[in-house]
Amino acid sequence: MQYTDTHHEPSSVSAPSDGSRTHTLTSGATRDLENEDESEAPRIVGTLKLRGAQSKKQQSKAKVAWDEDVVDNEGCGKKKSKICCIYHKPRRFDESSDESSDSAASDSDCSHGSPADNAGLRSPSTLGHHVTNIRGDDAEPNAYEATPSSGKKRRNV
């Protein structure tokens, strides 16, 4: 059994604006549609309906709906899906606040260079035990902690 496309439009016709198509399949041998007797109706086997992408009008209706529990991250009355937060792992009060992992901390017990190489990072009395000061209190915040400066001026409403 062969199937033919009963779509009579030329192939150069552009697609419908909504991207939908309908093809009707008929059974029987392929025949020349121009010489076909009009009294002989082809038997319809099935109809295939294809639906493409949504139209521009339908796409513009899709909006994000925020739940009431969504956090206003910037305090400006705007709710956003792109949230820039820095997670600081909770630590015990006697833990170091440096960002090194346990493996890096254990590596600090090994001395690969002269004590002069580590003079800025360790105090002489605790050399080989632990890091006492990596970043001073006067150090500038990193790019994630700093408040971005915007060229645009914000209006207070």
UniProtKB/Swiss-Prot annotation:
Matches recorded under Pfam families: PPI_Ypi1 (PF07491)
Start-end of Low complexity biased regions: 53-63
TM regions (residue ranges): none
Keywords for the protein's UniProt record, in alphabetical order: Nucleus
InterPro entries from the UniProt entry: PPI_Ypi1 (IPR011107)
Disulphide-bonded residues: none
Superkingdom classification of source: Eukaryota
GO CC terms: nucleus
Primary subcellular site in the record, as a coarse category: nucleus
Localization terms from the record: Nucleus
Spans annotated as Disordered: 1-76, 92-157
Extent of Basic and acidic residues compositional bias: 1-10
Protein name (database record): Type 1 phosphatases regulator YPI1
Underlying gene: YPI1
PANTHER family: E3 UBIQUITIN-PROTEIN LIGASE PPP1R11, E3 UBIQUITIN-PROTEIN LIGASE PPP1R11-RELATED
Species this chain originates from: Laccaria bicolor (strain S238N-H82 / ATCC MYA-4686)
Polar residues bias: start-end ranges: 11-29
